Amino acid sequence: MGEKSMPVLVGVGQVTEREFDVDSSSVLDLMEQAAYKAVEDAGISRASLAGLDSLVIVKSFRESTRNSPEVLANRIGATDATQWLMPNGGNGPQYLVNRFSEAIANGESQFVLFAGAEAMATARKIVKATGEQPPWQEVATCDPSYLVEDVELSTAHEQQHGLWLAPGFYAMSENARRHQLGHSVEEHQLGLGELFTRFTEVAAKSSHAWYPVQRSAAEIATATVNNRYVAWPYTKYMNAMNQINQSAALLLTSVEQARKLGISDDKFIYLHGCSDTKEKSILGRQNYYSSEAMRVMAEQVFANNSASGSLGIDDMQHIDFYSCFPSAVAMARDTFGMSVDDPRQLTITGGLPFHGGAGNNYVMNSIAAMVEKVREDRGSYGLVTANGGYFSKHAAGIYSTNPVEGDWSRTDPASYQKVLDDVPDTPSTESPNGEATIETYTVLYGRDNQPQQGVVIGRLGELGDPKAERFVAMVDDESDVLEKMTQEDMIGSSGLASRGDKLNKFILK
């Protein structure tokens, strides 16, 4: 097999358009710019893109045109490439690197471009100025083909009760973590600020960050007029920022093809380990303070091929944990066995709240940044993790300038996914009725920084009873009740759950 089937990343491109107006770059403009930056980084001509055999676009939150892969292929002269759209999920970019590295190793692909972008800041400005959607539609001959099935990451019942709101779900995970750790509300809140103040240190030094501003732990943790609560305990500064104009692109090929294209060996970045897992449905999980799918992902990224078998988390000099919310970072840190006081930075970009999270495509920016980081620090290793939905889909990759020894391979993800799938779901009901106990919760806030709605995940019975059915319910917006929920640890509190006309309700005793 050798060089012909050894996958390498050879070119990366990133664009952040902080200065913008109604006539600024569209989503496809940003993707095209990033693609050409990746070409420039690889040291090859734009005409080389005509030789792509595959082109994959990571879906934007709101697709700006009928078929973005076809439009981008037409723009860059890659019309012979097979064109795909990667559906929703922040795991997408790392999944693509993992999947197409395997395709290259198997001789099924030779030269691939991945790209993605969001221009939500510009789009929002256009809507405010004109009252119309951005005029970004471009001619396409057909609808896009999805690389994998585009499935909902929450059920209709879960969505009705607010679990489609990412801040709300991750805040519920955060409260479960706080309770499990035995922290007080005040202690844990400051800890969230301390976690993310280090992210702002990185963002402040980045030319690609949307908010290159260093903030203190207290500034991040304290709710103010400019930093309101979104979903308690999360303030605005703890939330992924998607109102941005950002893009990224990656070029993946084989060592043999790279040399045919004239790409210098010092551009080569090797994938030394990778993994992909999926979590159970939101209500079917074992708990909300940890993730079994993340645990298996962490195990497998260091174990699933010969290249990474001798590596561990202590060998990772550079890390970018997916960072949509603090619980995602802290859970990854704990899952990988890192201590709270580990001196290594947990981001190389500044993270989704401060670098900016280009929708589903953020991890393409973090991979691009990791490529640049390990090129600068030759011989080092970098770990990137990715998370889609509500801890729903996970992916990880290890990057280095060090060549992979022997043939590149990886364990079929289906083999370890089966272990996860074989664990029975926690029993749940859509129509709870009777005595119940809070398992976790959050309070959703309005733009006036006032609590609007409580959301509870609970059990009909005791928390320690594995047969106790799980449910999701709303807590009426009585201000004194909602305020109490933000001042005390309510996990383990009892109440009555019932099915209303449309929504489940929970009344605290």
For the regions a language model picked out, list residue spans one by one:
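Gly/Pro-rich active-site capping loops and adjacent beta-alpha segments
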Residues: 392
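Polyanion-binding and phosphate-handling cores
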Residues: 381-384
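A conserved active-site cap/scaffold subdomain adjacent to cofactor or substrate pockets
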Residues: 355-363, 374, 379
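Conserved "HGTGT" condensation-loop signature of ketosynthase/thiolase-family condensing enzymes
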Residues: 1-85, 105-109, 113-256, 264-354, ...
